[in-house]
Amino acid sequence: MTKLVINPSKKQSKINKEIYGHFSEHLGRCIYEGIYVGEDSPIPNKNGMRTDVVEALKHIRIPVLRWPGGCFADEYHWKDGIGPKETRKKMINTHWGGVVEDNSFGTHEFFELCEQLGCEAYVNGNLGSGTVQEMSEWVEYITFEGVSPMADLRKKNGHEKPWKLDFFGVGNENWGCGGNMNPDFYANEYRRYQTYVRNYHPDHPIHKVCCGANVDDYEWTSEVLKTTHNHCLKELHGNMDGLSLHYYVHPEGWEIKGSATDFDDKVWYKSLNKALFMETLIERHGHIMDEYDPEKKIGMIVDEWGAWYTVEPGTNPGFLYQQNTMRDALIAGITLNIFNKHSDRVKMANLAQIVNVLQSVILTDGADMILTPTYHVFDMYKYHQDAMLVDSSIETETIGVEEEWQVPNLAESVSVAEDGAVHITLTNLSLDKDYEIRTILTDYQVNEVKGEIVHGEMHEMNTFETPDQVRVKEFNEVEKTAEGIRFTIPKCSVLHLEVR
């Protein structure tokens, strides 16, 4: 029997709700068709936003949405996406499929979407091909209430009051598609650009996000922090509130990533092993951040993460459309548990991407919509948002099919909500073994337990023909004991227990 020990009174750090954030880019069918269909569409919508998608996202309590990219952000010129739609400039989306971008979804539409979702706004600015003035004027357009050219332009375009802007990314992937810069050059550009990302609302400051590393580029993290902290007052912590990190799971590598649906046991464990590498990245980048920011004033912002496979056969290679199986449910559960356990440093994360792109929570086909296994994991994990991480540990054994791709059989995180409920999320990575869990809750009297689970065979997925193949089901097989609870977690599953 496996032992899980939980100490609900030993609180460690707050799990920011933003850890459960999402990412939307002008890429494939994410924005257009997936979220925005226009006011004249026969698909039910409110001001152009699909009502089915909006309601589904509200159900999982989406806390923050990042936009407009991604690589698209550093070729996006925001003034092309305001004003009457018929006069907006068209452009070629050179990064993603070479399609025409008509800019019918712009700043006003994004904030309309955030308002409908009830979520915070994370805008990524254009440092790669844009100017300091362009970035400064965008922030002014969005947030300034007084008399100014940009505030007047916003009012002319139909929005009298400014919006609230919660996060602003000063460039994206500037080590690559955002300008192919070296870390010292980018850091100096960051210093200059961020100066003009002004806080016009002292009671609602913009949190500035600096472009961090790609995967394990620890030199980038070190050099960027060194340059931004040089000749900078200590209390300004490099003039940043967050430093980003991007990491994707590519089962077979970057060039040939592997199928989203056709994989064997070896690739299953290989994928989960790569998902677990997120913890190493957080720890090693976090160690470098500790040198410059021991008080953890700078949040680690994992604003692109998830599984990236070879696109579905017959789809545009530039649209990055892929299916979603129980493997993705496990990748999501593993990764979110890691974020929870490192919530002292990880302050926001954004799954790539929200609809129809990469590890989506929603897929659409015309008027039809399906919820993916990943969606259902976010649904179960939403109770961790703004809860307190508490001390927990679980006994594990190593499993897998080859020595190189071994993984622990179980992974967990536990939080306590404001109402005192203990929320346990547990993943079983094994393809063939259930585990009986003896759970000890220290100094805690268990009165009630509710459970829910997502589980199935590793290839199971939801399709437009069978949309409910994978879904959240009740889990009632929990026994109360003198020391806590006892239950058996099935193979290939993600479990959430609420204990009171």
Language-model regions: role of each:
Residues 249-269, 315:
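Active-site His/acidic residue clusters
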Residues 246:
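Histidine-centered active-site/metal-ligand motif
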Residues 1-242, 275-279, 283-311, 315-500:
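Non-catalytic accessory regions flanking glycosidase/transglycosidase catalytic cores in CAZymes
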